[in-house]
């Protein structure tokens, strides 16, 4: 409601950046597409709460405040491995647009409902992940994905040195994001070291 009121009254925040979308490599279409992914992420949060009130959803920790992750998804290739914080729905949505035949909104709703048809967890837990999107499943256990990201990044450089097949590109990048609570966790500290 607040965003609609702000747009209608044109009382939007003052932009402190002198860069235009074109100057950072974004077309108008890409900018609108990113915004759409962010809105979809936010509406999934709303829908999860509606489903929870109806007794149809069992996980309502949303991705509000993390919508900017959609831009990260656009910055990386869809086959760069991404180890995601459990609030990174906007990233998953944006990446799904880069890979044909994805049903990510439906899949995420199945996850919220703990449906056995959920393609990533089979109804065991709300999980962000997708094999076709190169996003290993990650639950809300904080920082547990950081060592996996380090190992995956190491495997890319190692695959260039030894004759071994790797599903990741030789010039691949491993992306990992996490929340502030993770940064003080011993698992994260081990990954940093």
PLM features per residue range, with description:
Residues 43-46, 53-193:
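Cofactor-binding active-site loop characterized by glycine-rich and histidine/acidic residues
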Residues 1-69, 75-76:
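Conserved acidic/glycine
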């Amino acid at each position: 409601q607040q965003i609609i009121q702000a747009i209608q009254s044109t009382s939007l925040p003052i932009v402190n950046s002198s860069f235009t979308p074109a100057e950072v490599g974004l077309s108008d279409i890409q900018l609108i597409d990113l915004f759409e992914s962010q809105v979809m992420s936010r509406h999934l949060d709303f829908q999860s709460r509606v489903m929870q009130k109806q007794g149809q959803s069992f996980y309502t920790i949303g991705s509000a405040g993390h919508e900017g992750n959609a831009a990260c998804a656009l910055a990386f290739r869809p086959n760069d491995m991404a180890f995601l914080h459990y609030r990174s729905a906007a990233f998953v949505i944006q990446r799904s647009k880069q890979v044909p035949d994805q049903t990510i909104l439906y899949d995420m709703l199945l996850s919220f409902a703990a449906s056995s048809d959920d393609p990533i967890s089979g109804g065991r837990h709300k999980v962000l992940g997708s094999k076709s999107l190169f996003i290993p499943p990650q639950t809300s256990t904080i920082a547990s994905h950081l060592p996996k990201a380090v190992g995956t990044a190491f495997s890319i450089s190692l695959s260039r040195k030894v004759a071994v097949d790797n599903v990741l590109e030789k010039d691949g990048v491993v992306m990992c994001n996490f929340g502030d609570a993770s940064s003080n966790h011993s698992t994260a500290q081990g990954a940093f070291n």
